[in-house]
């Protein structure tokens, strides 16, 4: 199977990557079948050989996640929703719903506590013996 992935080159801490087509069993920096582009993550510079990339994709080459993102930005692939993104969004949505429900329950409990406190204060006021006003002389 042919994979489209990044091949690292450059100095330490100043890396750049070549987008290459290679066998899926070959090493990351091994000899590629074909060089298809360039990507510099520091300057966000990207150069793509669009004709060669289209040909490799039509032959069934599978891009890595990073290369897929670069191809989507370059307009060679349509943005697709990946299962991991869907799962992440669903978990976030569930967390938001749970947080909203917890906040609602806390507000309800607080309102009930205030109501019972007010009722207790009113009952205490009714039960307290009324003090007589001192007689005016």
Swiss-Prot record:
InterPro entries: Ribosomal_bS16, Ribosomal_bS16_CS, Ribosomal_bS16_dom_sf. One of its GO terms (biological process) is translation. Residues 93-137 are annotated as: Disordered. Residues 128-137 have a biased composition (Acidic residues). Residues 116-127 have a biased composition (Low complexity). PROSITE patterns: RIBOSOMAL_S16. Residues 93-115 have a biased composition (Basic and acidic residues). Pfam families: Ribosomal_S16. GO terms for cellular component: cytoplasm; small ribosomal subunit. Keywords: Ribonucleoprotein, Ribosomal protein. GO terms for molecular function: structural constituent of ribosome. It comes from the Bacteria. The keyword Ribosomal protein applies. NCBIfam families: S16 (TIGR00002). Belongs to the bacterial ribosomal protein bS16 family. This is Small ribosomal subunit protein bS16. The gene is rpsP.
